[in-house]
Amino acid sequence: MKKLIVLALVVSVAVAGGWLWMKSGNPDALRHIVLEQCLVNQQQHRNPAPCAQVKPDAGYVVFKDRNGPLQYLLMPTYRINGTESPLLTEPQTPNFFWLAWQSRNFMSMKRGTEVPDSAIALTINSPTGRTQNHFHIHISCLRPDVREKLDANQGQISTQWLPFPGGLEGHEYLARRVTEAELVKRSPFMMLAQELPQAREHMGRFAMAMAQQSDGSFVLLATERNLLVLNRASAEELQDHQCDILN
């Protein structure tokens, strides 16, 4: 009985803490920046500011995040909240993960020298793991310890979604290997929804990440929200916005 009471308290604290964390600040700040500033400025003055790039025809912008020296965000030019949106599994929706990977050069331009692909990670958080309600993929540095674990387990990552050995940052992750050719043709969101039964109707429970491996392939990572173990499904935990991996 005592264990059940303690468990209930833990869940209550986790939920309350997550709710308060989500409510702090303006959750629509990024949406206002994209729709009311970047897009308007590009259309009226051919100037993407305050974004670094605006691609209206392709449906996305690239924006320099204030957190970290090299972190950028890729965001749509129209309303999509996040991983929970059914738009992400529709074939006409842009392949945002691939577009984000193609936008990684902004990190090198900002740094003034090349940022190796092996040092870069893309992440998107779940609704309980984010502070903003406009879809955004984080383009930033990979944590050095995560890079080491991905390298050490490269041979165990298959073309199916399987548990990553030992998890990452204290949380369970599923991993799947994809080639560049696969990634160009099909969005990771569609791969997760179509290949993982528990994700199909509950995409909003998941956060995702992507990094390149030494053989040129990519590893997709997905973690599912589990408040019992204080996992808000925030794949951004795999990134280091201070970029120690470059030191």
Curated annotation (Swiss-Prot):
Q: Per its UniProt record, what InterPro entries does this chain match?
A: CDP-diacylglyc_Pase, CDP-diacylglyc_Pase_proteobac, HIT-like_sf
Q: Which UniProt keywords apply?
A: Cell inner membrane, Cell membrane, Hydrolase, Lipid biosynthesis, Lipid metabolism, Membrane, Phospholipid biosynthesis, Phospholipid metabolism, Transmembrane, Transmembrane helix
Residues passing through the membrane, by range: 5-22
Q: Which organism is it from?
A: Enterobacter sp. (strain 638)
Q: What is its pathway?
A: Phospholipid metabolism; CDP-diacylglycerol degradation; phosphatidate from CDP-diacylglycerol: step 1/1
Q: Per the record, GO CC terms?
A: plasma membrane
Superkingdom, taxonomy of origin: Bacteria
Hydrolase found in the keyword field: yes
Q: Which family does it belong to?
A: Belongs to the Cdh family.
* GO biological processes: CDP-diacylglycerol catabolic process; phospholipid biosynthetic process
A Pfam family of the record is CDH
UniProt main location, coarse:
membrane
Q: Where in the cell is it found?
A: Cell inner membrane
Q: What is this protein called?
A: CDP-diacylglycerol pyrophosphatase
Which Enzyme Commission number(s) are listed? 3.6.1.26
Instruction: Report the membrane topology from the UniProt record.
Output: Single-pass membrane protein
Which GO molecular function annotations are given, in alphabetical order?
A: CDP-diacylglycerol diphosphatase activity
Q: Which reaction does it catalyse?
A: a CDP-1,2-diacyl-sn-glycerol + H2O = a 1,2-diacyl-sn-glycero-3-phosphate + CMP + 2 H(+)
